[in-house]
UniProtKB/Swiss-Prot annotation:
GO terms for cellular component: cytoplasm. Residues 10-286 form the tr-type G domain. Gene3D superfamilies: 3.30.230.10, 3.30.70.240, Elongation Factor G (Translational Gtpase), domain 3, P-loop containing nucleotide triphosphate hydrolases, Translation factors. The lineage of its organism: Bacteria, Bacillati, Actinomycetota, Actinomycetes, Mycobacteriales. Belongs to the TRAFAC class translation factor GTPase superfamily. Classic translation factor GTPase family. EF-G/EF-2 subfamily. It comes from Mycolicibacterium gilvum (strain PYR-GCK). The gene is fusA. Keywords: Cytoplasm, Elongation factor, GTP-binding, Nucleotide-binding, Protein biosynthesis. It is found in: Cytoplasm. GO terms for biological process: ribosome disassembly. HAMAP family: EF_G_EF_2_B. This is Elongation factor G.
Length: 700
């Protein structure tokens, strides 16, 4: 049995490692696990042997897709690490990890600085107010520039970096760091086998001035936020190491400053001081404010829970994974109280009872069973039947619903056709399991063709889902070409649209009459629909109102122009009529559906398409070709800048124009340019494109 869970929460850190796709995040995590004694042999991403990349596809592709939770120990402290993917297609993994973390290590590539993906992940961390420290990695790489990277953190992220280490040497001569808090050099001599030992020495003479300059900046930054330290500093007194660390910690936990460290995880340099910084500066569960939620079915009744074992039990399910032996694993963050394995709790989001089977603390895909789950920790649970991502589990007698998570809709879809009858059955199981694991994976049946259509966040995302269907669920299927996930919406408000549903066949008939307003709507947190009931005086019995709402939502699945989902609308039910005998829930559902279609047709419907933020890095010589090509793809150039000797073009381009871009870019620039893209927003398509989309969808 590994070390048990720590009950002193001041010694616990729940952290994520976040970064751009190739900044060296998984390698950094591997080194952490090695130095904290979890691994006896270092796993390399490029050998396909890393601990946190435990799915076959991850090991083959050398990228991290699922955020594995890993527990390790450092200097009597417990660190629970979530390794998040940096590839844009897997934003959902990053988003749900950040929701349950207390702090994070942002890893940057020392040559590239802040890249588009790092920017996106940084913004997601801002959304959840996650304190961070920055690790400038790959300092051994040709062209690595620590000071440039620090500048990009300030300029591109608008953050306040606090440099607490400087590199000694660069590229092949990178041998260690200067610790500006302790004013000592930490040097890894030679290629020490695995970097376990480093020497603490005096600062090299040629770097003494630079160290003094950055030390002064550091002291001034921390002193100006604390009156007592400021007086001491201006009085000419030295601040103690503990005072400096305490002040840095306070500023980091408040997300006012972001300490910046450096190293080379691959060359085993700088990882242990980074672990010290995780303990010294990132928050423990006790530093984080009480978690708030509401009473079930009463959203305005806010309640909170302190991160204490004395409070009633509450936890958030943030990830579902399928384990080869145990089946469904649910990862939970426990916010308050304790619970024994085998206990019965309630899923307050769904109002269903659940029994906790076995509880584990995970080490990538190895399990360490524990008897009890307690506040401040992350666990994997077996045996939960109805719980999905974002659900709250809590004490049945003192219920709370914690804030859930919002996930983006898919931007790309493919049709998938099973090859045989038995594949058809297996496909059903595969889709259900994968959808449980991944809230951004959506499935629907194309009403025209009868094909199953799956949607996701990008081509790589769908590739990997299809690959998992083949490998894990043994589904053989033909996969169509990627299609863009268009949406429909309306431009203007229409008032008092009426529809009467009437059917008279032998026996009891059907009758329902409804009157609605329909208007454009954009809600908070990405909500795309609202229903308001203004019916008075029992014109429609109360029990039928939800049926009108349900009918309207059904009709939203297929828009009126080209059959794409209808979004960003508000329905107000004004009036109606019913019949004592012939009215029913079904009749009002049909009326709700039909009146919405009728109203949408009159409300200037338009088609929306996903727009991607594209960043191309190219040598100067190819700038003209790159810009011309982006313009021909209906792209809008947003900015151009210089970065490490290359030119960077930022543009917004419709996703439909970006298929096959990687090959075109390669041939236009002789393979010397590269690009990345992230989903930005939905925008109305031009009229000529709209005509083409409608013609294609309606077969005209």
């Amino acid at each position: 049995m590994a070390q048990d869970v720590l009950t002193d929460l001041s010694k616990v850190r729940n952290i994520g490692i976040m970064a751009h796709i190739d900044a060296g995040k998984t390698t950094t995590t591997e080194r952490i696990l090695y130095y904290t004694g979890v691994n006896y042999k270092i796993g390399e991403t490029h050998d396909g042997a890393s601990t946190t990349d435990w799915m076959e596809q991850e090991q083959e592709r050398g990228i991290t897709i699922t955020s594995a939770a890993v527990t390790c120990f450092w200097n009597q402290n417990q660190i629970n690490i979530i390794d998040t993917p940096g590839h844009v297609d897997f934003t959902v993994e990053v988003e749900r990890s950040l929701r349950v973390l207390d702090g994070a290590v942002a890893v940057f590539d020392g040559k590239e600085g802040v890249e588009p993906q790092s920017e996106q992940v940084w913004r997601q961390a801002d959304k959840y107010d996650v304190p961070r420290i920055c690790f400038v990695n790959k300092m051994d790489k040709l062209g690595a520039d620590f000071y440039f990277t620090v500048r990009t953190i300030e300029e591109r992220l608008g953050a306040r970096p606090l440099v607490i280490q400087l590199p000694i040497g660069a590229e092949n001569d990178f041998i260690g760091i200067i610790d500006l808090v302790e004013m000592k050099a930490k040097v890894w001599r030679g290629e020490t086998a695995l970097g376990e030992k480093y020497e603490v020495e005096e600062i090299p003479a040629d770097l003494a001035d630079k160290a003094e300059e950055y030390r002064t900046k550091l002291i001034e930054a921390v002193a100006e936020t604390d009156e007592a330290l400021l007086e001491k500093y201006f009085g000419g007194e030295e601040l103690s190491i503990d005072e400096i660390k305490g002040a840095i910690r306070k500023l980091t936990v408040a997300s006012e400053l972001y300490p910046v460290l450096c190293g080379s995880a691959f060359k085993n340099k700088g990882v242990q001081p980074m672990l010290d910084a995780v303990i010294d500066y990132l928050p423990s569960p006790l530093d984080v404010e009480s978690v708030t939620g509401h009473v079930p079915n009463k959203e305005d009744e806010v309640i909170s829970r302190k991160p204490s074992t004395d409070e009633p039990f509450s936890a958030l399910a943030f990830k579902i994974a399928v384990h080869p032996f145990f089946g469904k694993l649910t990862y939970v963050r426990v916010y308050s109280g304790t619970v024994e394995s085998g206990s019965q709790v309630i899923n307050s989001t769904k109002g269903k009872k659940e029994r906790l089977g076995k509880l584990f603390q995970m080490h990538a895909n190895k399990e360490n069973p524990v008897e009890r789950a307690s506040a401040g920790h992350i666990y994997a649970v077996i045996g939960l039947k109805d719980t999905t991502t974002g659900d709250t589990l809590c004490d049945a007698n003192q219920q709370i619903v914690l804030e859930s998570m919002t996930f983006p809709d898919p931007v790309i879809e493919v049709a998938i056709e099973p090859k045989t009858k038995s594949d058809q059955e297996k496909l059903g199981t595969a889709i259900q399991k994968l959808a449980e694991e991944d809230p951004t994976f959506k499935v629907h049946l194309d009403q025209e063709t009868g094909q199953t259509v799956i949607g996701g966040m990008g081509e790589l995302h769908l590739d990997i889902l299809v690959d998992r269907m083949r490998r894990e669920f043994k589904v053989e299927a033909n996969v169509g070409k990627p299609q863009v996930a268009y949406r429909e919406t309306i431009r203007r408000k229409v008032e008092k649209v009426e529809f009467t549903h009437k059917k008279q066949t032998g026996g009891s008939g059907q009758f329902a009459k409804v009157l609605i307003d329909l208007e454009p709507f954009s809600g908070e947190d990405g909500a795309t629909y609202e229903f308001e009931n203004k019916v008075t005086g029992g014109r429609i019995p109360r029990e039928y109102i939800p049926s009108v709402d349900a009918g309207a939502q059904d009709a939203m699945q297929y828009g009126v122009l080209a059959g794409y989902p209808l979004v960003n609308i508000k329905v107000t039910l004004l009036d109606g009529a019913f019949h004592e005998v012939d009215s029913s829930e079904m009749a009002f559902k049909v009326a709700g559906s039909q009146v919405l279609k009728k109203a949408a047709q009159a409300a200037q419907p338009v088609i929306l398409e996903p727009i991607m933020a594209v960043e191309v890095i190219t040598p100067e010589d190819y700038m003209g070709d790159v810009i011309g090509d982006l313009n021909s793809r209906r792209g809008q150039i947003q900015a151009m800048e210089e970065r490490s000797g290359a030119r960077v073009v930022k543009a917004q381009v419709p996703l439909s124009e970006m298929f096959g871009y990687v090959g075109d870019l390669r041939s236009k620039t002789q393979g010397r340019a590269n690009y990345s893209m992230v989903f930005d927003s939905y925008a109305e398509v031009p009229a000529n494109v709209s005509k083409e989309i409608i013609a294609k969808a309606t077969g005209q």
